[in-house]
Amino acid sequence: MSLTKAETAKIIAEYGVKEGDTGSPEVQVALLTHNINKLQGHFADHKKDHHSRRGLLRMVSQRRKLLDYLKGKNAERYLDLIKRLGLRR
């Protein structure tokens, strides 16, 4: 269920603030969102996979924390990111 190197590089290039940027909140949220979307497809087939569901909830929580941090630091970047990712809120 993890991302390939090509997928990761594509997301980093699209959401990175500068070249080789892997630590900015935008990149981290985009990577988590991609992983979350992949796992949601997994749960359509495997409804009783509770172990993986715990990992999904952990990722959702981490994404929420990063979004809250970004909203507090720079609301404009936050609004741009949630619009680009198609997230609610």
Swiss-Prot record:
Record note on quaternary structure:
Part of the 30S ribosomal subunit. Forms a bridge to the 50S subunit in the 70S ribosome, contacting the 23S rRNA.
Member of which family? Belongs to the universal ribosomal protein uS15 family.
**Which NCBIfam families is this protein grouped with?**
S15_bact (TIGR00952)
The record ties this protein, via Pfam families, to: Ribosomal_S15
Q: Which SUPFAM superfamilies match?
A: S15/NS1 RNA-binding domain
Molecular function via GO: rRNA binding; structural constituent of ribosome
For biological process, the GO terms are: translation
Q: Keyword Iron, does the record have it? A: no
Quote the protein name from its UniProt record: Small ribosomal subunit protein uS15
- List the PROSITE patterns hit by this protein, alphabetically: RIBOSOMAL_S15 (PS00362)
| Biological function | One of the primary rRNA binding proteins, it binds directly to 16S rRNA where it helps nucleate assembly of the platform of the 30S subunit by binding and bridging several RNA helices of the 16S rRNA.
Biological source species: Alteromonas mediterranea (strain DSM 17117 / CIP 110805 / LMG 28347 / Deep ecotype)
